């Protein structure tokens, strides 16, 4: 049995926490996500990235996708959007290429069947009832649109959680270690993800654990 799920705040509203999160080094996992998204894109023109945070993943995607593709980065936190805007400016990416949108993942600002690809990384563990997000993804996706969703896996025990902290956050600050631990406790298990996706009409989405701490849900 995994440890009990302990929810964390849905929105990172604190500017200091947003800046601290931006300093955490997820570059390797971010790049792998962007590369997989580019592989799945199949010429998608409008890509919705849900819960984009500091926008480092959408920026990495923009570097790999054809020039005709645009990414709509949806984020609820004003503090995170401010960080995302700084990162976009620093990268020299046009707002027409990467749109930063204030929005709630449970009520996405897109028409039904209007989005040609949907991506999301490290959002689901923030959501008290993840089915609300999965239903919205099913609503806005065009029929058969590629989907790539990744997040953390809730550990089987506190001992496993401590091991993950040691392996992946030993050199991090106390706040960064706390953020990582809180996120692990708030995450879903692979079986919980599968059950939720099945209930929300997202046909053809395959779910697997891909690292010691991540799951991936994909539709090619």
Q: PLM features: residue spans?
A:
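Class I SAM-dependent methyltransferase SAM/SAH-binding core
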Residues: 48, 54-107
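A short His-aromatic
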Residues: 125-126
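A short glycine-rich, Lys/Arg-flanked "PGG" loop and its adjoining helix->strand segment in the class I
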Residues: 132-143
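Conserved beta-strand signature within the Rossmann-like core of class I S-adenosyl-L-methionine
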Residues: 145-151
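C-terminal alpha-helical "lid/dimerization" subdomain adjacent to the S-adenosyl-L-methionine
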Residues: 152-200, 206-208, 214
